[in-house]
Regions:
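Active-site microenvironment of metallo-dependent hydrolases
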Residues: 12-18, 22-126
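Active-site beta-loop-alpha junctions enriched in small/polar residues
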Residues: 9
């Protein structure tokens, strides 16, 4: 399995975090494998080069989680805290969608970013 992800609104938020940390607890994944499959690999599949990693030029999106509670504690987006200890502070979520979904989000007044998924073989080494 290259990536852990959800397929949109029918799946509750944070299911990837909760389920992924349960896999870590069961020794199905190491913590490093979980982080890679929940962040870096989905970003690569969706050709989002500024997402899924912490490095110079990246978007500075970070989720700090409590591994015991299997829940987010703090979320930083673009360098700004947008969620902490159950409270949403500010910011507007951005939907990631293919071209076919852009009109739907625009009609709803929800910011959306077009993604072009890659079906090329992934570089799994780094």
């Amino acid at each position: 399995v290259d990536a852990l992800s959800t397929d949109g609104g029918c799946i509750p938020r944070n299911v990837t975090l909760k389920a992924g940390l349960e896999l870590v607890d069961l020794d199905g994944l190491t913590m490093l494998e979980f982080v890679k499959k929940a962040s870096l690999m989905p970003a690569r599949i969706l050709n989002l080069s500024s997402k899924g990693h912490l490095s110079v030029g990246a978007d500075a999106d970070i989720c700090l989680a409590d591994p015991i509670a299997k829940a987010p504690v703090r979320v930083i987006s673009g360098g700004n805290t947008v969620f902490e200890n159950g409270k949403i502070f500010n910011g507007t979520p951005t939907a990631f969608t293919t071209r076919k979904g852009l009109d739907f989000y625009n009609d709803q007044g929800i910011p959306a970013r077009e993604v072009n998924p890659s079906f090329e073989p992934l570089n799994r080494l780094n």
